[in-house]
């Protein structure tokens, strides 16, 4: 659903931020 899509996007963004902040 729409809420699920948002949650997925947020998870992807958080993962990318985690990767960036590691470097």
Curated annotation (Swiss-Prot):
Listed GO MF terms: oxygen carrier activity
Record keywords, A-Z: Copper, Oxygen transport, Secreted, Transport
Chief location: secreted
Localization annotation: Secreted, Extracellular space
Tissue-by-tissue expression: Hemolymph.
GO CC field: extracellular region
Family: Belongs to the tyrosinase family. Hemocyanin subfamily.
The protein, known as: Hemocyanin subunit 4
Source species of the chain: Carcinus maenas
